[in-house]
Amino acid sequence: MTQYTPMIQQYLKVKADYQDAFLFFRLGDFYEMFFEDAVKAAHELEITLTSRDGGSSERIPMCGVPYHAAKNYIEQLVEKGYKVAVCEQVEDPKTAKGVVRREVVQLITPGTMMEGRTIDEKENNFLAALTHFEDGSYALACNDLTTGQNTVTLLTGSVEDILLEVYATGSKEIVVDSSFSKDELNKLTETLKMTISYEDATAIPEGLEHLVKNVSQAKLIKAVGRLFNYVIRTQKRSLDHLQPVEIYYTNQFMKIDVHSKRNLELTETLRTKEKTGSLLWLLDKTKTAMGGRMLKQWMERPLIQKERIEERLEMVETFVNDYFLREDLKEKLKEVYDLERLAGKVAFGNVNARDLLQLRRSLLQVPAILEAISLLDNAYAARLIQGADPCESLTELLGRSIQENPPLSIKDGDIIKDGYNDKLDQYRYVSKNGKTWIAELEKRERDITGIKSLKIGYNRIFGYYIEVTKANLGALPEGRYERKQTLANAERFITDELKEKETLILEAEEKIVQLEYDLFTALREEVKVFIPKLQHLAKVISELDVLQSFATVSEEEQFVKPVLTTKREIFIKDGRHPVVEKVLNGKLYVPNDCIMPENMDVFLITGPNMSGKSTYMRQLALVTVMSQIGCFVPATEAVLPVFDQIFTRIGAADDLISGQSTFMVEMLEAKNAIANASERSLILFDEIGRGTSTYDGMALAQAIIEHIHDQIGAKTLFSTHYHELTVLEDSLDQLKNVHVSAIEENGKVVFLHKIQDGAADKSYGIHVAQLAELPDSLIARAKEVLAQLEGQEEIVIPKRVEVKEQEVIPEPVVVKEEPVAIEETKVDNEEESQLSFFGTEQSSKKQDKPVLDAKETAVLTQIKKIDLLDMTPLEAMNELYRLQKKLKKG
């Protein structure tokens, strides 16, 4: 390092402590970057890469950005997942001996950004800290530095459970200890794009102990300690706005895994990853930024306590029924700014006068809001506003201290009102009247000298002066004027009287600016005292905002209040998919019932593509989520149970990036549901098994249906193109066939989008191809092939019968197979009975059990012993292939 100049040596010394961040190194009016930082930053920011002499034999790569524009460049880097260490000059270069002393004053990371375009006003910016313990449990602590919110929870499940919780927070950065498993980190970052940071300290930092008074578990305290230590290390400033840590338990909320949330498009769409087109987009009628954030949090964690859900529903009903109360509340909420983030800016010391003016305008609305809610005959409302302080003394303080239109900068003066401070008023009097005196002096000097062009001016170098053109110099009386500056066409003078007034005026103006700054910083400290009250008030207003939002959208979209039942029954009359209906924008939407009594667990849904099967399935899930966050639902009548979990496999969002095919994703999501679902869960499976061959897919689909029906008992919607599976209705007493209806007119299919009882009578695959405008010649050929195939092969679907333990041979049922594209083994027994899937008649021939040889019986015995739930899809396929080869050997 000794070969470098002292300044570069200083840079390298600072950089050594921030290897994982860009170092913005302050040099005068620029932030400079050197070496690898410069090369990478020039590429990422699209700025010029240059070089400079640093004392070594080779020039050093360098790039820089102006300090006044640095905020924009920092945001660009952080938005891409990088960290930025801001290194400032901490002493005056004029008085410095040698190299100016510099220190990192803040480390800006994706999880600690306070403001900027990366921070959506209606979204939290959570930083997560994860701690792993020897017993296999985890503790997850989260902090939103912009609002001061802190949460912690204990997780005892798998990495998938952690993934769910981190996804629910929307964290862009996660803090772990340096020994954390790299494999587990990879699992997290494969699904969620996050910046990984490290912090080994877990003791609660001094001065923050009061924030964990309600936390007793050592594991939770360690996670919070890791989080707080990282925040302190990166921010290096006041954290007075941090709120007491809230403990929550994941078993208090409905579980919806990451893939299901994406499939259902709860907060963003699958295709664009944007809010528009999601359920959140539809429900968000909030008027405040903090209300918008709370709404998203509610949607990420629907409730499972019936009483809490009903409390919310009753409040929503109150707002729905009282139009004037609702509209008056909305008008007041429009005037409320982001109290949570304003409190954060106060604590961080970067609040300006306009921010405090916004705070005052917000507080002016609070008394009327609290009074209106207090008049409601509602226990939930009374409990909600209990302890809420309107902070009227703060409103009064801000009202008499801050000007109505203050500048953005707090160093330019013109912030504090007249009458707030006596000394400031005196200085302003001198400044204002001093300038008046200057104008009067100019008039008097003109009269005395008779020089009409004489003028008094001012500049920063020479101060006040009397300027006289050279043509008029002879008119000046001798001895009274002292020459100050000579110009080409004029001379500038000063008098003793002007000197005296100049001193008074300039001192007053300087003192005004400094005193206003001092008064403002003192005022800011006074406001800090109110931070806890402001944060409590923010929560009250946020909750009211979400509830009125539910009421507003329920009124506008004609939603109905759901009735919650402790029974395992679903009764939805004229249900609609809320987002699809909204996007149709007035066009006809076909509503559908979903009626599943306690003794009906599985709907097996058939019907052509594009007919609405997936929409119907998503519709039920969204109605359930809406109900359990406390919102009315899109139906004319709804009776719903409280579900503990939702599992879905809808759509074809393959995980190709991580090397997983459609079929693998299907199997993993099916495994997740089978392993974790309870009879209080909701399962939605759309065409499970389509990612493999017909026989394999059909076998797996049937096995999954039977397992859910027999072992789990969860309410399930299972759509399929394997029409042969509809015979399961005969053997599974809690399964019912339903289909999406369609009709054929003049050779064209018309989708009716109506769910009806029974199985579909036709597939309409070629008709869908026609709608997609495939070439006519191709369509014609497909019809020829279909006609040939329809009369060929038959598939034996094992019919479920009650058997004793030693019996291994199922009773077969034969059904006609749809076209397949693989070579299959023909059924030898031509005398087996025929079950026509598309018709209603069934052969009355007696079905004889097939005679199996010893080898076939042995294979069946092996199949019976296989534990499919304990195998991966690949292992299952390999085992199936091995058994097939065994049967084919002569």
From Swiss-Prot:
Full protein name: DNA mismatch repair protein MutS
Encoding gene per record: mutS
Source organism, top-level taxon: Bacteria
Keywords: ATP-binding, DNA damage, DNA repair, DNA-binding, Nucleotide-binding
SMART domains: MUTSac (SM00534), MUTSd (SM00533)
A GO cellular-component term linked to this record: cytosol
Gene3D superfamilies xrefs: 1.10.1420.10, DNA repair protein MutS, domain I (3.40.1170.10), MutS, connector domain (3.30.420.110), P-loop containing nucleotide triphosphate hydrolases (3.40.50.300)
UniProt xrefs under Pfam families: MutS_I, MutS_II, MutS_III, MutS_IV, MutS_V
Coiled coil: none
Disulfide topology: none
InterPro entries, sorted: DNA_mismatch_repair_MutS (IPR005748), DNA_mismatch_repair_MutS-lik_N (IPR007695), DNA_mismatch_repair_MutS/MSH (IPR017261), DNA_mismatch_repair_MutS_C (IPR000432), DNA_mismatch_repair_MutS_clamp (IPR007861), DNA_mismatch_repair_MutS_core (IPR007696), DNA_mismatch_repair_MutS_N (IPR016151), DNA_mismatch_repair_MutS_sf (IPR036187)
MF GO annotations: ATP binding; ATP-dependent DNA damage sensor activity; damaged DNA binding; mismatched DNA binding
HAMAP family, per the entry: MutS
Binding site residues for ATP: 607-614
